[in-house]
């Protein structure tokens, strides 16, 4: 007898959505939450990403805040690492620590149907 498919957890769905962001593009915590169907869960997206192991294949660095800035503060060099990784993908930050969202922002295709099928 086949087991019924379990719906992916919120955290797993966050990871699946973030994996769709191509190199050189960025998204926001709110954009990820909106792609999952609830833009009010931006903070939970951040928590999910902060739980990733260091050897992950999820491109966490491509998720920034809605002001175009990196949100990590005082986390053992994570902000510097994120900025370095994004820089290697062609994402530049200005003197205020912000990137141009209108240039680099990834607009999701409608992912809800595909994610709900899992």
Annotate each PLM feature.
Residues 1-118:
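Nucleic acid-binding interface residues in structured DNA/RNA-binding domains
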């Amino acid at each position: 007898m086949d087991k019924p498919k379990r719906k992916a957890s919120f955290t797993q769905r966050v990871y699946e959505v973030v994996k769709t962001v191509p190199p050189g593009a960025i998204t926001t915590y709110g954009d990820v939450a909106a792609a999952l169907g609830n833009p009010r869960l931006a903070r939970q997206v951040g928590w999910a990403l902060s739980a990733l192991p260091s050897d992950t294949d999820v491109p966490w660095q491509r998720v920034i805040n809605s002001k175009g800035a990196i949100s990590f503060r005082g986390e053992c060099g994570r902000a510097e690492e994120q900025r370095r990784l994004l820089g290697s993908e062609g994402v530049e930050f200005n003197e205020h620590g912000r990137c141009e969202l209108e240039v680099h922002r990834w607009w999701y295709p409608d992912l809800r149907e595909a994610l709900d099928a899992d």
